[in-house]
Amino acid sequence: MKSVDHPVDVLPAEHSAETPGDARASESSLLISETFVSRQGEGELTGTESVFIRTSGCNLRCWFCDTPYASWKPEGTRQTIEDLLQLVAKSGVKHVVLTGGEPLIAKGIVSLIDQLRSAGNHVTIETAGTVDPGARCDLLSLSPKLRASTPDAKDHPRLAKMHAERRLPINTMKQLIQSAEATQVKFVVDSADELPEIDEVVRQLEIAADAVYLMPQGISVEQLDAARPWLEPMAISRGYQYCDRMQIRWFGNRRGT
C-alpha cells in the first residue's frame, strides 16, 4: 500500500480531548495524522480502493480506540487543503475516506469535502456523529458510540464524564443523515448484551435495518474469528448486516492500511 510520510508533531496533552489546539491552525490547513491509499475494509464499500485522509484529534475517548495516535495521544502535521487536493489528484483514485480521530471537528473540513466532491471524487466521512459542521458527503459512515465504549471512570474520571456526555447526540446524528447522499451505521460491538441498546439507537435514528452494520470490537484476526459465531447471527436476527474488519485480515493491525 502507498503511504505519505511526514514529520510528526505531537499535540500537548491538554488539547488532546478537543479540537486540536495550535496557534497556526486556520481553515486552510488541517492537522493530519496520516494519508495513504488502501482498500476500504469495512461496510458497503469493502474492497474499494480509496485514499484515506486521517485527521488528528477527537472529542471522544473510546477505551478500545484502534487509532490512539489520532485520539488519546493525537499527533500529526499541518497540511493545507491544497496539499490534500493535490495528493488525491496525483493518486488517481476517486474514492476518498475522511477518517480520524474525529474528522468533523477539524477546522477546514467542510471546505476540503466540498472541493474534493467538486473535483469529481466520492467522499466517505467516517464519524461518531457528535458534531454537525454542515458538511455534505456521498457516504456518511456513522459509528454511534455505545455505553460500553466509555473509558474506566476510576482511571480517567474527567474523560469518562466528557465521553458519556458527548457520545450520543441523536438529533445531531439525524441532521448528518439528512445531509448525506447515503448512510451506513456501524456499531462496534463488544458483547451480545449491547443488542437492546443498539436496537434503541436504530429506532431513534429512524434508519433502515439493512443500513446497519454490527462490527466486532477487536484488533486481531483471532478476536474477529471469536466474535463472528455469535455476532453474525445476532445481526441477521434483526435484519442488520455483519461487518468484518477486512483491513485486519489483509494487513494486520498497523498504520497506513
Swiss-Prot record:
InterPro entries linked to this entry: 7-CO-7-deazaguanine_synth-like, Aldolase_TIM, rSAM
Listed pathway(s): Purine metabolism; 7-cyano-7-deazaguanine biosynthesis
Positions contributing to S-adenosyl-L-methionine binding: G101, S143, P144, K145
Binding site for Mg(2+): T67
Co-factor note (free text): Binds 1 [4Fe-4S] cluster. The cluster is coordinated with 3 cysteines and an exchangeable S-adenosyl-L-methionine.
Catalysed conversion reaction: 6-carboxy-5,6,7,8-tetrahydropterin + H(+) = 7-carboxy-7-deazaguanine + NH4(+)
Binding-site residues, [4Fe-4S] cluster: C58, C62, C65
Assigned EC number: 4.3.99.3
Cofactor(s) needed for function: [4Fe-4S] cluster; S-adenosyl-L-methionine; Mg(2+)
Enzyme class, spelled out: lyase
Ranges for region Disordered: 1-25
Domain annotation Radical SAM core: ranges: 45-244
GO biological process terms, semicolon-separated: queuosine biosynthetic process
Any one GO MF annotation of this record: 4 iron, 4 sulfur cluster binding
S-adenosyl-L-methionine in keyword set: yes
Keywords, in A-Z order: 4Fe-4S, Iron, Iron-sulfur, Lyase, Magnesium, Metal-binding, Queuosine biosynthesis, S-adenosyl-L-methionine
Chain positions recorded as substrate binding sites: R39, Q40, G41, R54, T99
Quaternary assembly: Homodimer.
PANTHER family: 7-CARBOXY-7-DEAZAGUANINE SYNTHASE (PTHR42836:SF1)
Assigned protein family: Belongs to the radical SAM superfamily. 7-carboxy-7-deazaguanine synthase family.
Function, as annotated: Catalyzes the complex heterocyclic radical-mediated conversion of 6-carboxy-5,6,7,8-tetrahydropterin (CPH4) to 7-carboxy-7-deazaguanine (CDG), a step common to the biosynthetic pathways of all 7-deazapurine-containing compounds.
Record-given protein name: 7-carboxy-7-deazaguanine synthase
Organism: Rhodopirellula baltica (strain DSM 10527 / NCIMB 13988 / SH1)
